[in-house]
Amino acid sequence: MSWFPIAIALVLGLAFGSFMTVAIYRVPAGESLVRPRSRCPSCGAPIRTADNIPVISWLMLRGRCRACGARIPPVYPLTELASGGLFVAVALAYEDPWRAVLLAPFAGLMVAISVIDVRHRRIPNRLIYPAFLIAAAVIIVGDLAGGGLDALDAGIGLVAYGLGLMIIALISPKGMGMGDVKLAGLIGMVLGSIGLDLVAVAAGMGILLGGAGAIVALLAGQGRKSAIPFGPFLAGGAVIAIFVGHPIADAYLNLLT
């Protein structure tokens, strides 16, 4: 792949990450994603267009507001960098344009959902529901256009992963919330459109990461009653499946044969 599409993917990823930073702060607060324009979280001063360039502006301002000098949280540039990196990685990993268009913003969304779940212990419907609609539209159109997406497998993945976590949530409501169930359904739908083996890998890795996180929390003295957000582990499993899901599934099947 030439450098030009990679550069385009990076720019789009940074821009998407910048939008996700707005969502991270505004969605949990019930604020509009469009108005008012971006502002300093400390003094509320509107951020100039020149100071709103992803990553670069934060570095130029040394992580501080131009108006009041207050520290701007590093979650802004880190989210933008993560999104930009994921967009580039997806562009390099997937030659099929329909798959890339579906997976790149999905991976960036996983970053935002993880941050929100860690901070607020919930996964907002304002992000999940639009993601369902947009992803479903891309999958259906991509399937009809002969792209590398399968709408039927997407539906199977949605039901399988979503229903699986719903059963767990009903059995152990304190350990799993309905936000996690909806996120699992979204992951199952998106990854299922690529291959059902990716859904299996995402589920397995999500469980492994969640178990490791629970062990770390116990060792850190948080105790069994402390709420541990499961969304980041589901999101992490999904991202792992995007990039190495097929090799992991193949390796597992080889062990069984």
Place the predicted regions along the sequence by residue.
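Transmembrane helix interruption/hinge and helix-loop junction motifs
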Residues: 93-99, 192-201, 244-246
